[in-house]
Amino acid sequence: MKKAIVIDGNSLIYRAFHATYKQAEWAVEKQLMPTNAIKLVASMIFKILNQEQFTYGLIAMDASKQTFRAQEYAAYKATRKPMDAKLIVQLPYLKKLFVAMGFRIISQPGIEADDFVGSFSNLMNKFDVDTTIYSSDRDMLQLINKNTKLKLLKTGTSVMQEINLTNFSLLNNGILPYQIIEYKGLVGDSSDNLIGVKGIGPKTAINLLLKYDNIENIYTNLEKIAPSVKNKLIEHKDMAFLSKKLAAIQTDLLFDEKLENFVLKPYNTQELDELFTSLKINNMQNYYK
């Protein structure tokens, strides 16, 4: 069976950058261009591609902070810090790296990388292609199905946890992938600055979802719910539904694309050589020659 790989580019890059931040500081002190993220991202992806054969591939990137979610809810991701200048200078080289590795890159203003990851996974699913998502973003849990699994980056970049349809419920307190957005609607998501229902924590949210399945059913059955919880649900109803809506990843952005548009190309060894030489990055050739 053919297989596909989709990488949440920003997630991987941020992880790599912060895991090796001292290297970036050292480079700046020596008046050199930081290359810490480039080196770690390159080695990580080379290892993945050299261990498993993929037919199709995509790296999804954020293009801008202003997205349709931010337009609908001004506080969306408002607490996130701007990208570090020591990482910004590495982005053009990272994109060159991805292309030389054979990937197609998708990035579009107004649309988050998550939505392209979801849309790519959905496209692959339609053609029964097994898909692996690489990300540190737990929002991706909602995309897991019989054809799609998530390699969740944990502990910097050194540990990856595989989450699939078989182990999903065990690892997520009994809920299923489609209930991830229901859960976020109730408890919110601090990383995205989604509020959810104030006063409802993970345990209460899980119990509600195990009993009522989704937010709509919870509100239909308010009279059966304990008054202390019911009152919170009533008070923050609008935010519950908004948080759920904003947490949902779009999956229909690539419906008119063809499979062949995402064929993973062989390594372009000449471009890789030139890139690493120009950046004075050594010991990479063993990965691709």
From Swiss-Prot:
Pfam families: 5_3_exonuc, 5_3_exonuc_N. It comes from the Bacteria. Keywords: DNA-binding, Exonuclease, Hydrolase, Nuclease. SMART domains: 53EXOc (SM00475), HhH2 (SM00279). Its EC number is 3.1.11.-. GO terms for molecular function: 5'-3' exonuclease activity; 5'-flap endonuclease activity; DNA binding. InterPro entries: 5-3_exonucl_a-hlix_arch_N, 5-3_exonuclease, 5-3_exonuclease_C_sf, DNA_polI_H3TH, FEN, HhH2, PIN-like_dom_sf. The keyword Cell membrane does not apply. Residues 176-269 form the 5'-3' exonuclease domain. NCBIfam families: PRK14976.1-4. 5'-3' exonuclease acting preferentially on double-stranded DNA. This is 5'-3' exonuclease. It comes from Ureaplasma parvum serovar 3 (strain ATCC 700970).
